[in-house]
Swiss-Prot record:
Belongs to the glutaminase PdxT/SNO family. The gene is pdxT. One of its GO terms (biological process) is pyridoxine metabolic process. NCBIfam families: PLP_synth_Pdx2. Keywords: Glutamine amidotransferase, Hydrolase, Lyase, Pyridoxal phosphate. It comes from Sulfolobus acidocaldarius (strain ATCC 33909 / DSM 639 / JCM 8929 / NBRC 15157 / NCIMB 11770). The active site is at C84, H181, E183. One of its GO terms (molecular function) is glutaminase activity. It comes from the Archaea. In the presence of PdxS, forms a dodecamer of heterodimers. Only shows activity in the heterodimer. SUPFAM superfamilies: Class I glutamine amidotransferase-like. PROSITE patterns: PDXT_SNO_1 (PS01236), PDXT_SNO_2 (PS51130). This is Pyridoxal 5'-phosphate synthase subunit PdxT.
């Protein structure tokens, strides 16, 4: 199993560590690959789009030709986990809590509406416990950093976990989106669940 993590900016190392921990817990043999060029996408069985600045990630990925390559692979069934900025990249509908609709390069494969910077400056970063029973876990502490929120889902996209009147984890076929940072959690449940989607 080869899992790619888009590695232009954001928490590549943290995701790599969590993926390796999750592989170990699930007794899976695999490696984590930094995805920077279109050819890297051909090597992987699943991809993580990490947190960071979604506009920057999108612009770099578009310029290097990775954006279209990943979009085509996701549409063909490649499992993907988008976290925070990665969830924004996956969304078909994106707006900003302050400035409304925002134009930026997106992958745009998931039937979710995401609002950037949802929690505002008062709560730029915070931690809370979420219940992961729906994906086979228990309660786990998670970190939100200038987090977006998933306002709604449609078609066969479904809300998995909600918090404070918004969706913080959603799923649609081979796509998984979280508005928190599972790579900064002690728990590996989100990465384990993602790896189980690759294994199928």
């Amino acid at each position: 199993m080869k899992v790619g993590v888009i590695a232009y900016q954001g928490s590549f190392e943290e995701h790599a560590i969590q993926l390796k921990r999750a592989m170990s817990k699930l007794n899976l043999t695999g490696e984590v690959i930094a995805v920077k060029k279109p050819k890297d996408v051909d090597l992987i069985d699943g991809v993580v789009i990490p947190g960071g600045e979604s506009t920057t990630i999108g612009i770099i990925a578009e310029k290097l030709g990775v954006l279209d390559e990943i979009k085509a692979k996701i549409n063909a069934g490649l499992p993907v986990l988008g976290t925070c900025a990665g969830a924004i990249m996956l969304a078909k509908d994106v707006s900003d809590a302050k400035v409304g609709k925002k134009s930026q390069p997106l992958i745009g494969t998931m039937d979710i509406q995401v609002v950037r910077n949802y929690y505002g400056r008062q709560r730029e970063s915070f931690e809370t416990d979420l219940d992961f029973r729906v994906i086979g876990g228990g309660k786990a502490r998670v970190v939100f950093i200038r987090a977006p929120i998933i306002k709604r889902t449609w078609n066969d996209a479904t809300a998995l976990i909600s918090f404070e009147n918004g969706i913080v984890m959603a799923e649609q076929k081979n796509m998984l989106a979280t508005t928190f940072h599972p790579e900064l959690s002690e728990s590996t449940i989100v990465h384990e669940y993602f790896l189980s989607k690759i294994k199928k």
